[in-house]
Design a protein with these regions (language model features):
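Conserved helix/coil segment N-terminal to the catalytic DExD/H
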Residues: 1-15, 33
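Conserved interdomain linker/interface between the two RecA-like ATPase lobes of SF2 helicase motors
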Residues: 72-138
Length: 267
């Protein structure tokens, strides 16, 4: 279904009895719209861990306004389907109040400059991130971590800084070759590196069960993205007691408002 011409390969609208779509929160995307409006299966099963959309659009109309089965994050943790986590909001003195606020979020180029260029104090912030990580992790030998960054420059800067301070790290971006991404994952799991810093990767579709430390190194206005990134560390793994989350909270723009009703609340 990644092909725009998939309907030409299977033109019969009733050909499929059962269609399963993962990450169904993407249903508003044009490619999904084409699929959903074209085929008429007897059963349509949509699955997502993040049904809430920041644009307010609901996925429920595809299912007659009803959710067949639902389990929320706290319930999944209580039932030991997911790993418990400890979440620390770490004070970040980086002043974001003067960064332009456009289209419901911070200007990413300005954020990138603040987080990766020395004239804006990027090295001081990276030093603070490393100090706080050292304060909260129990044993560096056991760390399997991901750091979510705002830009390619930011991811590289953080990886370089950690490496320069004896914390083996790598960074991955959309420019990274598939073979290198696979190798990075193997190195993280084996303990050869302690952190992988990423931008626009690992939000979904990646399963690294041993991840036990997550660093939120940028503001995230999207609840969906926040939960997806948090979810990278919630998989159960042998010997993993809990996930440690460090959220570096800067002096933010006062336009931020984290409110999002659940799909049931929207009914």
């Amino acid at each position: 279904f990644q092909s725009k011409d998939f309907t030409k390969h299977v033109p019969d609208k009733n050909y499929y009895d059962f269609i399963i779509i993962d990450e169904f929160h993407h249903a508003a995307a044009p490619s999904y719209q084409l699929l959903l409006s074209y085929y008429e299966p007897k059963i349509l099963l949509g699955m997502t861990a993040t049904p809430e959309r920041m644009d307010g659009k609901s996925v429920l109309p595809y299912f007659d306004g009803r959710i067949a089965v639902e389990i929320r994050l706290p319930d999944a943790i209580d039932r030991k389907l997911l790993c418990p986590f400890q979440y620390f909001g770490v004070n970040d003195t980086t002043d974001l109040s003067q960064i332009r606020w456009t289209r419901g979020g911070y200007d990413t180029s300005e954020l990138s400059n603040v987080y990766s260029m020395e004239q804006y104090g990027a090295k001081k912030r990276a030093e603070w991130v490393l100090e706080e990580t050292d304060r909260y992790v129990t044993d560096w030998n056991d760390v399997t971590g991901l750091g979510f960054c705002v830009s390619k420059a930011h991811a590289k800067f953080m990886s370089d800084y950690f490496n320069d301070h004896d914390v083996p790290s790598m960074y991955l971006t959309s420019d990274t070759a598939y073979a290198d991404r696979k190798s990075a994952k193997q190195k993280l799991v084996s303990g050869q590196v302690k952190f992988i810093f990423v931008v626009d990767l690992y939000n979904e579709g990646v399963d690294i069960k041993s991840v036990n430390t997550i660093l939120f190194l940028r503001p995230t206005e999207s609840l969906t993205i926040f939960l997806q990134q948090l979810g990278r560390g919630l998989r159960l793994s042998e010997g993993k007691e809990c996930l440690t989350v460090l959220d570096f909270i800067g002096q933010a723009n006062n336009c931020l408002l984290y409110t999002s009703p659940s799909p049931r609340d929207r009914q």
